[in-house]
């Protein structure tokens, strides 16, 4: 029996039927990586235990895919000269602040009230770009004059947790849980900041491996099933 147990323990682990092996190098903005991608990748690896993934998180978009990258996820409408672009959809945004900040500075009742508040944005609002808010067929533009300028949406939301202001580009996909836990308060819930378009980028001239194609399909399916994300049905 002891020898039989030894043979069982030393036998090679069989790969689950239909699973994928190999390695994938993927790059994504910090907010998408932490809020969405890491849980999805770990779920994908549980299905495919012999798959290795190298994930690099960055601040802001990329205009050129690095040669060592198999998949890049970009948000925003930025051109990328060496990529095949597959649209995923859009990330819905919301505005949030802490109870402490709102108690001290007041709760905005209209978009115009935001001009008297400290507004915390991401990389797409640091160079003088205004905040665009949508409600049905209405569109309002709010200028931003922030004392604290942050190039990352997650950092802006963290600053809001510490009473620094109103995070105006927080992604709904991972912020609603903080609202449900009463750590943040949804500001002007009838108004929604312009959504952020998101795409999968694949290098031109390189045939994607079966592992890359499978992970892209998995990400697209996860995107489709998340009610806080808008899926592009043309994918």
Please name every model-derived segment.
Residues 47, 56-150:
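Acidic, Gly/Pro-rich loop/turn segments at junctions of secondary structure
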Residues 12, 27, 54-58, 187, ...:
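Solvent-exposed beta-strand sheet faces enriched in polar/charged residues
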Residues 86, 112, 157-158, 213:
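Alpha-helical segments flanking ligand/cofactor-binding loops in enzyme cores
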Residues 50, 172-181, 191-235:
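C-terminal effector-binding regulatory domain of bacterial HTH transcription factors
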Residues 141-186, 192-193, 208, 216:
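Hydrophobic hinge/microswitch elements
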Residues 21-81, 232-235:
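Central regulatory/effector-binding core of bacterial HTH transcription factors
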Residues 1-15:
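Alpha-helical "hinge/linker" immediately C-terminal to small N-terminal DNA-binding modules
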Residues 25-27, 72, 120, 165-167, ...:
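Short, well-ordered beta-strand segments
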